A protein has these predicted regions:
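Short helix-initiation/N-cap motifs at beta->coil->alpha
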Residues: 65-95, 108, 186-214, 223-225
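Bacterial N-terminal signal peptides
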Residues: 10-19
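Pocket-lining segment of extracytoplasmic ligand-binding domains
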Residues: 110, 204-298
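A conserved helix-loop-strand patch within extracytoplasmic ligand-binding domains
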Residues: 109-110, 121, 127-210, 214, ...
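Immediate post-signal peptide segment of exported/extracytoplasmic ligand-binding proteins
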Residues: 24-32, 55-57, 77, 143-161, ...
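Conserved C-terminal helix/tail region of periplasmic/extracytoplasmic solute-binding proteins
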Residues: 336-368
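Secondary-structure end/capping motifs
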Residues: 267-342
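Short, polar/charged alpha-helical segment
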Residues: 30-31, 37-81, 86, 91-92, ...
Length: 368
């Protein structure tokens, strides 16, 4: 006589399924990947949108939930699931790493440097791009270039207020360095009326253009595409690309954003980190060859005017270069002169702290 399956049978089946799913979950790690709505992170957004079109690269992203969750696929097999996290700035990215709420991310090299100096266990993996930063004034401002800005700052009766999106952002640090080299006294204290320029923290990129439009600040300094968007919306004018700041040639090919990973992620999932670095490096090369399409895809992803994204003059780097390292060393010098470093980076050059800042084993293995 046939007996109905008992409770024990169902318990055993449930346990078996749990074990199978547990093994599967262990094989496919779920990692949180942070990025910012900026054209500096175009390669990651392009990789997500192109998907299987990049299959020939040997590594690509397959959407699970578009713009939210993706599988990292290698030779047709998923090796990880990426949960995308949009951050407001490099400073927030570093803070999320410190709280163990990110595994991989893209952010400015200066933000990652600052985080590592504070003791956050993470490493720079590879470069993303150089340049793509500008100083923007309101459309009706009489200022036309760097020299007219300096003249105005020296004659103004109170500090000229310039907004930035993050205290550890590359645009803010470059501008501050250039101002000081030009003999301009800079402060972040609104009560310091002896200064000629007041730098104001606007907290995130989305606040920059509204602050400029409302005359909350007299200028903004930030990464692409925000200077270009200000122009496209008729709100502002770019009076200087930061690469052209004095001294002549000093700021050319200056580093900005990088990829980074927590030390824990590197230790636990080196195979995933390797393929993530490979994907970004190969997509960087693709973006350099397909600038128009890359700009269009970025505009669609972020929700920008297409002309603004396409106007970004960025150079994406598949590998570290000598000029990139020289620029990173200049950042170290500037940040030390400002007294920003209190930890292991204090008083050091880039060569002295490479093992502290970088894990280059992954990018060194990438064949383009």
């Amino acid at each position: 006589m046939f007996k109905k399956p008992g409770l024990t049978f169902f318990v055993l089946i449930s346990m078996a399924l749990s074990l199978i799913s547990g093994v599967w979950a262990a094989e496919i790690p779920n990692l949180k990947v942070g990025y910012i709505f900026t054209t500096h992170h175009t390669p990651f957004m392009v990789a997500a949108q192109k998907g299987e079109a990049f299959k020939s690269m040997g590594v690509y992203l397959r959407p699970v939930v578009p713009k939210d969750k993706y599988e990292l696929v290698v030779n047709g097999k998923p090796i990880a699931v990426f949960q995308l996290i949009v951050t407001k700035s490099g400073a927030e990215t570093a803070a999320l790493f410190a709280r163990k709420q990110l595994d991989l991310a893209m952010a400015s090299v200066t933000a990652i440097m600052a985080g590592i100096d504070k003791g956050t266990p993470m490493k720079i993996l590879s470069p993303l791009q150089t340049e793509g930063m500008g100083l923007v004034v309101p459309k009706d401002s009489p200022l036309t270039d760097w020299n007219s800005f300096l003249s105005y700052a020296k004659k103004a009766k109170q500090p000229v207020k310039i907004g930035y999106h993050s205290p550890t952002s590359a645009p803010k640090i470059i501008l501050e360095g250039a101002l000081k080299q030009s003999g301009i006294k800079v402060t972040e204290d609104p009560n310091d009326q002896s200064a000629q320029v007041l730098l104001a923290d606007l907290k995130e990129t989305t606040n920059m253009i509204p602050a400029l439009a409302s005359k909350q600040v007299e200028a903004i300094v930030g990464p692409s595409p925000f200077p270009e968007v200000a122009v496209s919306r008729g709100v502002g004018r770019i009076i200087v690309d930061l690469r052209d700041l004095p001294p002549a040639g000093y700021w050319h090919d200056f580093p900005c954003c990088v990829t980074a990973a927590s030390d824990q992620t590197i230790a636990k999932h080196p195979d995933v980190v390797q393929k993530f670095v490979e994907l970004i490096a190969k997509t960087n090369a693709w973006c350099n060859k397909n600038r128009l399409e890359a700009g269009t895809l970025t505009a669609e992803w972020i929700g920008l005017p297409a002309d603004a994204a396409k106007a970004s003059m960025l150079v994406y780097l598949p590998k570290f270069t000598e000029s990139w390292m020289r620029g990173a060393d200049k950042y170290m010098t500037i940040l030390n002169q400002m007294g920003n470093f209190k930890g292991p980076l204090k008083g050091k050059t880039i060569n002295e702290v490479k093992p502290t800042l970088f894990d280059m084993q992954f990018i060194d293995k990438v064949k383009l």
